[in-house]
Amino acid sequence: MIYHEIYDVIVVGGGHAGTEAALAPARMGLKTLLLTHNIDTLGQMSCNPAIGGIGKGHLVKEIDAMGGLMAIAIDQAGIQFRTLNSSKGPAVRATRAQADRVLYRQAVRTALENQPNLDIFQQEVVDILVENNRAVGAVTKMRLTFKARSVVLTAGTFLAGKIHIGLDNYAGGRAGDPAATMLADRLRDLNLRIDRLKTGTPPRLDARTINFDVLAKQHGDAELPVMSFMGSVDLHPRQIPCYITHTNEQTHDLIRNSLDRSPMYTGVIEGIGPRYCPSIEDKVMRFSDRNSHQIYLEPEGLSTIEVYPNGISTSLPFDVQMGIVNSMKGLEKTRIIKPGYAIEYDYFDPRDLKPTLETKAIEGLFFAGQINGTTGYEEAAAQGLLAGINAALQVQGKEAWFPTRDLAYTGVLVDDLCTLGTKEPYRVFTSRAEYRLLLREDNADIRLTPIAHELGLIDDARWARFNQKMENIEREHERLKQIWIHPQSEHLAVVNELVNSPLTREASGEDLLRRPEVTYDKLTQVAAFAPALDDKQAAEQVEISIKYQGYIEHQQNEIERHKRHENTLIPAEFDYDKVESLSNEVRAKLMQHRPVSIGQASRISGITPAAISILLVNLKKQGMLKRGEL
């Protein structure tokens, strides 16, 4: 049976990628359908109950700057907020929030159900409908076919998912949910490279059986940060602490003595796991010189007894898991509510994607999330947003859009994936971004909100708030430029208390703020420079832009130099075999990756600057040398 209504965009999967992928085209005015195997698990946090962190918080801010949901949802569901790296420079500061799983899921579902132009339908998808090499719909398990002009697939860990606990395993997409086996089989028939990855999760603990009195507490920040540019502390629910315990030699001995029952160490699991979120088995074996590992006990919500022990992800048998838990301080009598497990799943080689996340093999088919080889809610959501935007733009007949590496962490993520691919679950770090001083959390809206407005992604309220902020920044810059302190000023004594060396000549407010020891808050406490802006976001921008002006300008100049060739396009029909001066190895790599620009080509492993120079010469010889927006 064919459903009577034809959609502009169909999104398959209701996780973190799927929700953003569905909301984006709906906000742009396109008729969108979200297909999910279970409406009750929309926005489900399958692993750790937290949003944000180093690099990840930057992605959340970018999603929010473009009208996405994740930041608003965590502001409504966060039960502990912290700013990480708060003592370091603004480029690496990151917001992290512990989440109440139920509140987060409720916030996501409410947003989806109240979004105009968006329909939700509960059914497992078993096939992507492809006609004339173009995705035109999806087929459900009850043989109901939905037609659409583009399709976004966000299947997470469900494609041929296999759950491992000890040497036992069974099909599953995550604990309690079935694997998408039929869809995985169908996708293997398409012209796409597929491999396997693995991830894992720790056992969940019963809070009533934990001795919190002997454990160290970890509170959130006294001055609570917010995640969304439109957010407020008033949105936050009650805040609660986390707790800290540690593994010990008894724990490690138990793990080492149980490796013959580990699916990873006996070769049962073939997929590669996330490097930066290793299992406790991996940590014990890889860091054998350490006699202890720190474990964070994170409450899963305000209305549940479940506790997430961050740091002991494991696929060891249940009896070993019990031993691991009970070997730690404060957990001697703790009961496990849910066992930890590892899950293997299919993922697609992201080098087979365009930077828009459309597959190169099938028009109108977009991939987002863990099926592209990433790990993390934030990475998934950022991809979902981008895929949803481009699915909509394609339907509208408009030019595709994606952020470059100097514009957003989302751009770094997508460029790394599409250019280099990945053999292990990929996560974002600030260290992956060469222009991180420009890609800060605090300026994500300045970088991306005007683009979002042009694309039709944000509402009038957000646009008005953004413009008011920009006006406040401009006015405050001008005000601080105009206020001067001279050696005879009545305010000199107060100013000299702020600075390390007394003033010997006149200085403006901007001059003083450039000094490392002077903050905006301290400066505006001086009567001459009062009052401070009420708009805290604008005040932060004023301080950062003044204090780091020289570094920012240097990085902008570096970007301009790089861009001279970054956006030089390589035509799809360019024949590398005719470039005889390239080595066979370089030619093979270029033909395999088919980079769309010189910038992409330069980031392929083994492509030297000399090879790039040869490419440029040959493009010019053949009259193909042109720059443009990708």
From Swiss-Prot:
Cofactor(s) the protein needs: FAD
Family matches, as Pfam families: GIDA, GIDA_C_1st, SAM_GIDA_C
Gene name of this polypeptide: mnmG
Main location: cytoplasm
Domain of life: Bacteria
The protein's assembly and partners: Homodimer. Heterotetramer of two MnmE and two MnmG subunits.
Keywords: Cytoplasm, FAD, Flavoprotein, NAD, tRNA processing
Subcellular location: Cytoplasm
GO term, biological process aspect, one: tRNA methylation
Binding positions for FAD per the UniProt entry: 13-18
UniProt xrefs under HAMAP family: MnmG_GidA
Organism: Actinobacillus pleuropneumoniae serotype 7 (strain AP76)
GO molecular function: flavin adenine dinucleotide binding
Positions bound to NAD(+): 273-287
Protein name as catalogued: tRNA uridine 5-carboxymethylaminomethyl modification enzyme MnmG
GO cellular component: cytosol
